[in-house]
Amino acid sequence: MENVPYKQVIGCIRYLVSCTRPDICFSAGLLSRFMLNPGPKHWQAIKRVLQYLKHTKDLAITYSLIQSDSYHGILSGWTNPSSTLSGWSDSDWGGDVDNRKSTSGYVYTLGGGAIAWRSKKQTTVALSSTEAEYVAAALAAKEGIWIKAILEELNLFKVPTLELNCDNQSCINLARNPKMSDNIRHVSFKHHFLRDLIEDKKIELKFTPSTSMWADFLTKPVSSQKHILCCKNIGLLNFSKVKEKNMMF
C-alpha cells in the first residue's frame, strides 16, 4: 500500500464534501480514520466512493425561489416551507467498533437546499443513545446559532426560533429539563448550553420520525432508498433534470 495515493485521494474527496457533496460526508470521515495505516479493503472502499461520484457527477445542491415580499434582500420570495432555515441532528450509538464512540451528524437547509453539514466522531463514549443524540444536538446547535446570527447580521431575514429536528424523544425531554439527572452528570458541561438556547427560545428541538431524519446518512451507512431520500430532501438533485425549471443554483 506504500505506492497507493490514499491520503491524496482522501484530500480530494474531503474537498468535494466541503463544497457541494454532503452525500459522501460520512464515507469521507470514516475512510479518513485509516490514513496512517490503510489496508487493501480501505483502498477498495475509496474506489467505490470514486465510482459513486462518477455515476452521480450531475448531482448539485439546488435552491428554490418563489416571488414574495415576506423577506428582505436577496431572499425575497422564499415562502414555501422548505425556504425557512431548518436543521436536522442525528447520531448513531457506538458505531465505531474499535472504541465504541458514536458519530454526530447535522445538516441545515435554506431555500430547500443544504447550506451546512457535518459528520464528526464524538470524543467520548456515550453510555446511551440518548446521550449520543444529546451531544449531537449540542454540536448542531452551535452551527445553527452561527448561521442564524449571520443571516440576521446581513439583514436577510430574522429567525425568531431556530427549528432543529431530532428523532430521539428522550433527548428532547432531556434538553428541555433544566434539572441535572443521574443519567447525564458525567456529560461535559460544554454540551449543556443547549438547554440555555432552548430556555431562551433561540432553538426549538422538534421530534421527527427516523423515516424523515435527513441527517441519517451523515452518521451511519443507510440503504440506497434512504440515501436517495436524504439527498432529495436536502436539495441534492440531478442538476441536468432541473436546470430548465425555476431553480437557482
Language model features with spans:
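Conserved cytochrome P450 K-helix E-x-x-R motif and the immediately C-terminal K′/meander segment
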Residues: 45-86, 91
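Conserved helix-loop functional segments at active or binding sites
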Residues: 55-59, 114-116, 146, 150-153
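Conserved pre-motif C helix in the palm subdomain of viral-like polymerases
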Residues: 3-23, 92-95, 103, 130-146
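RNase H-like nuclease fold core
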Residues: 13, 84-130
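Short, well-ordered loop/turn elements at secondary-structure boundaries
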Residues: 10-12, 19-20, 55-57, 79-83, ...
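Beta-strand cores of modular interaction/reader domains in eukaryotic scaffold and signaling proteins
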Residues: 25, 60-62, 109, 163-165, ...
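C-terminal reverse transcriptase regions that engage the nucleic-acid substrate
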Residues: 1-60, 64-65, 209, 217-219
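RNase H-like nuclease module associated with reverse transcription
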Residues: 34, 68-84, 102, 120-249
